[in-house]
């Protein structure tokens, strides 16, 4: 259904509050288009017409999580709810409300206030990384296979990593092992935590997620601090022939902390380190 160079209208049909500032938005595709047709880890662009310009933002859907391929095996009992072909897709978006210090997130506030039944436009896919399942990736047109996958994610950068995790763990034929670092300010900022916890619990050891908080309260029993070399080495798979790393998060965290630590450990950009 998606087209890279043509905007297509979709209708907002549901908005569900997940936390004080996070919503799950369900959009309905045009009547004759049941499939979104997005590759795992890819993004859609949302476009909203302002008076003098078009506001555009990219998001990775949190549904569908599996391609429309009825012959594939799934380890999930609610297969239809996560598989493409329903005529809808879901975005999980954190709303950055305006304050005295900053104007807030333009698109997230538009979505938060948009009436149910109103239309917005989408196009895509964007993103050069596609997870094909069972460790196979197509990255900028080149094929890669990784048996072990490391993810370094921050804030809303969790969403492409979540789509990869879901695809790998919902497919009963996929044997890929995944280690993830998910960095946030506080516990309430962790997107999709319940879903990640459920995937980890049901993974039989294939998935391990390390949440690290920079502004945790006394009740937080997990990892505290920032992403650094020690955390990366303690939480992720070490460099190896079939080990890849995928990154998505704030530029400061990625450029100043994660990438230097990964390089020093022995990983190489565009060989086994990639950004969503």
Question: Model features per residue range: what roles?
Answer:
Residues 2-118, 184-186, 214-215:
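Ferredoxin-reductase
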Residues 41, 157, 250:
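Short, conserved phosphate/pyrophosphate- and ester-handling motifs at nucleotide-, phospho-/glycolipid
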Residues 52-60, 127-136:
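Short, Lys/Arg- and Gly-enriched loop/turn segments at beta-strand edges
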Residues 146, 169-178:
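Conserved S-adenosyl-L-methionine
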Residues 156-161, 254:
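Hydrophobic/small residue at the entry helix of a nucleotide-binding pocket
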Residues 160-172:
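Histidine-anchored nucleotide/phosphate-binding helix
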Residues 176-276:
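Reductase modules of NAD(P)H-dependent flavoproteins
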């Amino acid at each position: 259904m998606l087209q890279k160079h043509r905007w297509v209208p979709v209708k907002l049909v549901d908005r569900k509050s997940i936390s004080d500032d996070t919503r799950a938005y369900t959009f309905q595709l045009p009547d004759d288009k049941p499939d979104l047709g997005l590759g795992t880890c890819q993004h859609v662009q949302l476009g909203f017409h302002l008076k003098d310009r078009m506001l555009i933002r990219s998001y990775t859907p949190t549904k569908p999580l599996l391609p429309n391929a009825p012959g594939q095996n799934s380890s999930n009992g609610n297969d239809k709810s996560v598989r493409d072909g329903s005529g809808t897709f879901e975005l999980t978006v954190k709303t950055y409300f305006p304050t005295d210090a900053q104007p807030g997130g333009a698109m997230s506030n538009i979505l938060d206030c948009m009436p149910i039944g109103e239309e917005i436009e989408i196009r895509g896919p964007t993103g050069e990384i596609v997870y094909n399942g069972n460790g196979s990736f197509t990255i900028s047109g080149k094929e890669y296979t990784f048996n072990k996958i490391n993810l370094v994610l921050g804030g809303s950068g969790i969403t492409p990593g979540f789509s990869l995790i879901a695809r790998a763990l919902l497919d009963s034929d996929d044997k890929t092992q995944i280690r993830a670092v998910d960095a946030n300010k506080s516990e309430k900022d962790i997107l999709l935590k319940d879903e990640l916890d459920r995937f980890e619990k049901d993974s039989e050891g294939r998935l391990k997620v390390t949440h690290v908080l920079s502004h945790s309260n006394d009740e937080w029993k997990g990892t505290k601090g920032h992403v650094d070399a020690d955390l990366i080495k303690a939480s992720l798979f070490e460099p190896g022939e079939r080990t890849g790393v995928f990154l998505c998060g704030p530029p400061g965290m990625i450029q100043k902390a994660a990438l230097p630590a990964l390089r020093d450990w022995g990983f190489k950009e565009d060989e086994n380190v990639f950004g969503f």
